[in-house]
A protein has these predicted regions:
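Mature extracellular/periplasmic domains of secretome proteins
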Residues: 80-88, 113-123
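Structured segments of extracytoplasmic/periplasmic soluble domains
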Residues: 2, 11, 226-234
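A generic structural motif
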Residues: 96, 117-131, 150-154
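Noncatalytic luminal/extracellular "stalk/propeptide" segments of secretory-pathway proteins
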Residues: 1-92, 96-104
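Extracytoplasmic/secreted cell-surface and envelope-processing proteins
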Residues: 13-15, 31-32, 101-110, 134-139, ...
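Loop/turn elements at helix/coil->beta-strand transitions in domains of secreted/extracellular proteins
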Residues: 88-92, 122-125, 189-193, 238-239
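Active-site alpha-helical elements of protease catalytic centers
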Residues: 214-227
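Soluble metallo-hydrolase cores and metallopeptidase-like ectodomains found primarily
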Residues: 58-80, 129-213, 229-238
Length: 239
C-alpha cells in the first residue's frame, strides 16, 4: 500500500510532513452490528454475560435441536469427518471447550477455527462450553465459518433441547491504517529503536455491545502513545 503523509496533527512527532505517515489498507471485516440473540429452551441468554459470539460467525436465523458431542470425537484426525457426516446438519453441537483445547491445539500457533470449523458444511451451529467464558475478540473477523459459533461458560445447561439463534452479520471492505511516526535522535540519529504495537481486539457485537479492546492489546497502544508524548517533549539520543 502507498504510504502518504498524515494530516492527523495528534500523531505529529516532528516539524515536517516527512516525519509522520499514515498507511491505508483495505481488508475484509465481518461486521456484526445487528441482532445477536441466543435463546435456550425459551430462556433468552445475555450476550457477553452468558455467552459470546465468535467474530467470524455469519448471518443465521432459525431453531435447532441441541446435541452434545462425546469427547471421544475431539480427535484432530477424525473430528472434521465425523462432524461433517451430515448427522449434525440441523443441530447445534455443544462441545467441551476445555477438552477441545487439550486435544485439538496440536502445535503452537495453530488456527483451530480455520482448521476444524471452516471445513464443516453440514453443521447447524457450534456452542463451545467451558468452565470460563472466553472474552469477545475481533481479530479473526476476516473470514466466515459456515455456521455461527458461540462460546459459553459452565452455566450453559447440560440438558438443553432447543436453541433459537438470530445473528445478523455482513462481510464488508474496511479501511484500516498503519501509523508510522519518527523522532530523530539528538546524538545518534542514524541509530534507531523501533517500537510497535497492534490494536485489533476492538469492535461491535450486536447493537448495544461495544468492545474497546481493553481486555487485550489496547493497553499496548496506550503505552506507546504515552511514550511518544514523553519523547516528543524529551528528545532521545537515539532515533
Amino acid at each position: 500500500s502507498e504510504i502518504v503523509p498524515s494530516d492527523a496533527g495528534r500523531w505529529w512527532s516532528g516539524t515536517g510532513a516527512e516525519l509522520s505517515y499514515m498507511q491505508h489498507f483495505r481488508h475484509p471485516l465481518n461486521a456484526q452490528r445487528g441482532a445477536v440473540e441466543l435463546i435456550v429452551d425459551g430462556k433468552k441468554l445475555v450476550n457477553t454475560v452468558d455467552y459470546t459470539l465468535k467474530e467470524f460467525s455469519p448471518t443465521y436465523k432459525g431453531e435447532l435441536e441441541v446435541v452434545y458431542l462425546d469427547n471421544k470425537h475431539l480427535d484432530p484426525n477424525t473430528f472434521c469427518k465425523y462432524m461433517d457426516s451430515g448427522k449434525f446438519r440441523n443441530k447445534a453441537v455443544v462441545l467441551d471447550w476445555d477438552r477441545f483445547k487439550e486435544t485439538m491445539f496440536t502445535f503452537p500457533g495453530i488456527e483451530v477455527y480455520k482448521t476444524y470449523f471452516v471445513p464443516l458444511k453440514n453443521v447447524g451451529a457450534i456452542i463451545c462450553r467451558g468452565e470460563e467464558l472466553l472474552p469477545y475478540f475481533k481479530s479473526r473477523n476476516h473470514f466466515n465459518t459456515p455456521m455461527p459459533v458461540f462460546m459459553a461458560d459452565a452455566s450453559f445447561p447440560l440438558d438443553a433441547r432447543k436453541v433459537s439463534i438470530n445473528v445478523e452479520a455482513e462481510m464488508i471492505e474496511n479501511d484500516g491504517h498503519n501509523i508510522i511516526a519518527y523522532i530523530p535522535g539528538s546524538k545518534h540519529p542514524e541509530k534507531h529503536f523501533i517500537l510497535a504495537c497492534h490494536y485489533d481486539h476492538l469492535g461491535i457485537c450486536g447493537q448495544n455491545d461495544i468492545f474497546y479492546g481493553a481486555n487485550d492489546n489496547s493497553s499496548g497502544t496506550a503505552m506507546l502513545l504515552n511514550l511518544m508524548r514523553h519523547f516528543k517533549a524529551n528528545q532521545p539520543e537515539y532515533s
